[in-house]
């Protein structure tokens, strides 16, 4: 009797899951000893788990850029330093096995899923990274210390994983800017790659916290992306910074159930608010609460100078005539 061929094991395609620093070092060393091509690189995607298609887009991009024999590491760590009093640290969704299966299909080689005592062996760190003034406005104003906590763990994970490339979503625009500044200001030898926001078909930006929304709240939350799209259209038509903000604010204010923390049009390299006469690239940012869920979103816009009023040249010429 012929024994049927055993189908390929899904387990064989799973990434190596490591929980300790020693296990991570072994995984890094094993890849180095495997003789990767000189064009292959090590890439890292840092997450807090509860992965969705937005995270998987980061992993797929990391797989593509690392090269066929490169090493893609996904970190899954709910960082307590990023949560303030009364925030959802205890209830933040966690599903390690489900997350591992998802990143396996996206091309991850290693999952580093440490516990807080592994990342912070001495408890809360005495020395932390400061986001400076970037961490004092917008998200920093509403979540004091959040960006400092994010930068501290990012720097630690960069040291632990030693990547050539690190991938971050553009949905967390202020955090991405802070990471870029930290890497540049502190001479960290890594290339930071921003990946565009992934949205559901209805426009809602993917977020692990979307799971908290009821069906009605989810429909209400669509006002965020709708306001950003409308603001971008006004910017492209020459409406000016004030009109961009007024249009976006009007949509948010008209939607019952949306409580806005901030709506701002900022310089994408500094997060400073742009002046009323600004033209050129800008970033339209919003943070709002729908029910008990806090959501953020943003849209890159190009503020076009308003068109010159018709007839101005003729009028000027007539006034100059004797």
Q: Which ranges hold each PLM region?
A:
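Nucleotidyltransferase catalytic core that binds NTPs
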Residues: 2-258, 264-266, 270, 299-300, ...
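Generic C-terminus detector
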Residues: 283-322
